[in-house]
């Protein structure tokens, strides 16, 4: 690593080749040194146990609509009351929630059944503004919040809000789902969008945790882990 030039770009395929070569060299050294003691896996055992897998095929499905337009939100709320249909309404807020107009805030405040969606938040001032925005709502501790930011999830969970962890929390296996359950106690989760349906069906879902999955979702460039690499 010390011999690499500063600013050198290495493609993902080349990184994989280097990894494979490193594994081959390590395996060769182990064969050449019979006295080498392999690690005893029992020394690193854990008391964590996965919950029994609950088949996602037997669950009752519910519909949810994700929108980010004030007029559509108002229309959807009126339609829901008119037809008396049971579905969730999720409203995606901008990262800079301080620009939210009073008219929209009042509508969200008057309809506590609307789930608020906070996308990934990178700046500290945006994070603090999001926390303050939620706390200004009437009976905010009873709100359901969908968020892709674990810091925001942690702060709002302390206030009593029901938390749904979004796809950017990168829930990709049963173990990190269990860790999130222990640390943040979410009411529901959306697995990583990198997982296909067959992988999601194999997840061990903890008790009192709803499994959400988007049928359609807007994805952005440079968002996945592969793009970031």
Which residues fall in each region the model found?
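Non-catalytic helical/linker scaffolds that mediate oligomerization, partner binding
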Residues: 1-229
